[in-house]
Curated annotation (Swiss-Prot):
Compartments (UniProt record): Cytoplasm
Protein name: 17.6 kDa class I heat shock protein
Pfam families reported in the protein's UniProt record: HSP20
Principal place of residence: cytoplasm
Domain of life from the UniProt record: Eukaryota
Assembly and interaction partners: Forms oligomeric structures.
Length: 153
């Protein structure tokens, strides 16, 4: 039975909270997390990185972004940088906005790739809001098998 949840959500909705059905909330509107939620999706771009036998593959969910709004760069020889920016739509002075829920803002993520990554062969593609970056790996040198020879004598 805490009032703290009202700081983080716009309405209490716990059926076990006897005050959840109260229509008056003295804290409503004092602290708003809307600006944080507004840009959270873009600022905290989530990226998966997996290593296959042939390559390092990074996938980023960037819903609603165009490939022109995203950059993939190599810095300092081994650092892969993925960045982007989504701008708000231009407002016409006669427009009346009822809700603005789509996020806008910038993001930047950097990944230091291991020595076996071929940084000069990085490829990136964007399809259906998912950016896929493929960094091929250098082939591991096959070490000759060492066979021990018994010494007689």
């Amino acid at each position: 039975m805490s009032i703290i949840p009202s700081f983080f959500t716009s309405k209490r909705s716990n059926i076990f909270d006897p005050f959840s059905l109260d229509t008056w909330d003295p804290f409503q509107g004092i602290i708003s997390t809307e600006p944080a939620r507004e840009t959270a999706a873009i600022v905290n771009a989530r990226i998966d990185w997996k290593e296959t036998p042939e390559a390092h593959v990074l996938k980023a969910d960037l819903p609603g972004m165009k490939k022109e709004e995203v950059k993939v760069e190599v810095e300092d020889g081994r650092v892969l940088q993925i960045s982007g920016e989504r701008c708000r739509e231009q407002e016409e002075k006669d427009d009346t906005w009822h809700r603005v829920e789509r996020s806008s803002g910038k993001f930047i993520r950097r990944f230091r790739l291991p020595e076996n990554a071929k940084m000069d062969e990085v490829k990136a593609m964007m399809e259906n809001g998912v950016l896929t970056v493929v960094v091929p790996k250098e082939e591991e040198e096959k070490k000759p098998m060492v066979k021990a020879i018994d010494i007689s004598g």
